[in-house]
Amino acid sequence: MLDKARSQSKHMDESNAAASLLSMETTANNHHYLHNKTSRATLMNSSQDGKKHAEDEVSDGANSRHPTISSASIESLKTTYDENPLLSIMKSTCAPNNTPVHTPSGSPSLKVQSGGDIKDDPKENDTTTTTNTTLQDRRDSDNAVHAAASPLAPSNTPSDPKSLCNGHVAQATDPQISGAIQPQYTATNEDVFPYSSTSTNSNTATTTIVAGAKKKIHLPPPQAPAVSSPGTTAAGSGAGTGSGIRSRTGSDLPLIITSANKNNGKTTNSPMSILSRNNSTNNNDNNSIQSSDSRESSNNNEIGGYLRGGTKRGGSPSNDSQVQHNVHDDQCAVGVAPRNFYFNKDREITDPNVKLDENESKINISFWLNSKYRDEAYSLNESSSNNASSNTDTPTNSRHANTSSSITSRNNFQHFRFNQIPSQPPTSASSFTSTNNNNPQRNNINRGEDPFATSSRPSTGFFYGDLPNRNNRNSPFHTNEQYIPPPPPKYINSKLDGLRSRLLLGPNSASSSTKLDDDLGTAAAVLSNMRSSPYRTHDKPISNVNDMNNTNALGVPASRPHSSSFPSKGVLRPILLRIHNSEQQPIFESNNSTAVFDEDQDQNQDLSPYHLNLNSKKVLDPTFESRTRQVTWNKNGKRIDRRLSAPEQQQQLEVPPLKKSRRSVGNARVASQTNSDYNSLGESSTSSAPSSPSLKASSGLAYTADYPNATSPDFAKSKGKNVKPKAKSKAKQSSKKRPNNTTSKSKANNSQESNNATSSTSQGTRSRTGCWICRLRKKKCTEERPHCFNCERLKLDCHYDAFKPDFVSDPKKKQMKLEEIKKKTKEAKRRAMKKK
């Protein structure tokens, strides 16, 4: 069983070593290890022999030393794990058996520290060499899962196969030294170090590995105060615990790292151990990136990680830098992580199908909704007040390195304030790994160029590492900084967003004056209030509640009720319902149910207000005169006075009892068209009758012999040739019973004419004295005898008959007459055009 486990672990080690070699060959920093193949073969044999010897030595409880590994700046690599993160699940990189043994000895990052103990104790040197191999391949495999490094990032890795160890140069590629160090056993400890960023700008930190740990190693709290200087090393030569640099947010990284024992070979590949490997990997992912604050540290803000592990009994330091340490100092070891290490929490690390350009080119404009209320809301001064030093430290996005346009990130919208948007969309997290600080045009703003021509625009995003300074300088009073507009959004959500983004985000001048901001804010507010805008607000407060004449319920001025800029609901005038007399039932009950209501009946009903005597006017409502005169306009634009409907007036009137008159024999037409009680209106109706001869004739036909008859056959012939024979016979019958006293009738008519003219104009009644052609055409008649002006212009026969002609009463003849009128009208227009 042990042999089977060894063969499996051997096979896994070889495959992992091959994968790590392929990933290392792609980097620019590790291109120089290929020439040293002899040392690689020697190291392979030494590590395999050391494995066999270690199993015998561990059971005897031999003392193990603590070799110190010196690590230069370990640059993280972006491999296929970033494109397909499922590889990190299929192949765990924190497992003990995944340790490759084929690490080339010429790799630059990890070297055996040379000292006086190298030749004295070969076991200790073998442990150091094997642990060097372990850390190198672990670093290549583990860092590839989480790192998304940029090729623009500066590297502190030495180009020659040398490594600084506490200020000394260690030559590990010498064939004599590598030959002298023959391995006899491997280290039983295969711990994984936390990924904490350590600043190694000038000095290189040392890494001490505990060689005999059998338990879970927890990160203790730092035992030294946090140092924010970028040049501080993670471990000093005089202190065993060292001092690490904590992050600005104060969040330590509590990583739990599983260490397996080589003596228990049967449980190495057991399900529990596999679960512990995956859990440790997940803990590295989840705990290392606890919040967005831990990602907001810049490249100069590092996090110090600490390892504490138990050693075997009698463990002692392995080099001269730890000879001074006591037994308690041996319990703690300081781990060094890559300097430019970065955990990408953006969407491309969780979803392999999402590409970088699709994720970062969208812009969220939902925070522009209330941008018109405050000055700082639309002036866009969220991060434009960063000084020149923060701008020089702000990395340029690698995707827009040439176009220098900033990119928004979905995960950074939590930095928006409630009603405020920043001047720049926050750049994506992957852009912080590129530190292109050699941009000479970063602070040079060409004020005359187009804001959308972003080829020479520099990119300024959020400087996450400088959180306290950013918060202090972020007040809306710091508006005199240089403003760089972001690029236009790739996706326009509505038809107003293009104009809105030009007004808010792209001024032609880079100034942020108060007047310009006020103008832009006013323009944005106007755009938001348009009816086609999706940002239109309907809850505008009423400025003055008492002044309801100027504003309605929505605060819209009533002077422009139907303007396109304001809603027209609630500002319409109330509709006045008017019931015309022709559509009303008669006031008095009619004996003839088949009576036709026409304009003649309107005439009879219009006379009702004037039947009152002087005493009857006292009973009227005082508001009657004002309510009867309704000022309206006809379709030609003329102003006319209209009275209210007749039933409303009749309810307010008290009609006095009038003198009854005898019915005439020839009153058949009047009895058939009007109500039976109409004749009770007798004298007052005749006294206010209109003055036209046709209506005089009708009054003579209808009423008593007090008024002489004027409808002689000669008068009928002169006034209308188309009079019915029936009407002529009626006129003859009535003339037999009435005396021919025309002089008395003319005097009475002249006196009534003047009274009727004044009363009709004062009350605003329509005239019924026009000819039948004008009444049929609904035109104003000039009432000229024998032909009015309209009939003479159209060359039509003018009819002033007392009763309706057949082309008015008969519908078929009426239609024919209307067609004739149309033809005559066209002919008259042609003649008028010819005269012009």
Swiss-Prot record:
Major localization listed first in the record, in broad terms: nucleus
Residues where Phosphoserine is found: S114, S141, S150, S228, S316, S318, S645
GO cellular component: nucleus; Rpd3L complex; Rpd3L-Expanded complex; transcription regulator complex
Domain of life: Eukaryota
Post-translational modification: Phosphorylated by RIM11 and MCK1.
Additional record remark: Present with 217 molecules/cell in log phase SD medium.
Protein name per Swiss-Prot or TrEMBL: Transcriptional regulatory protein UME6
Gene: UME6
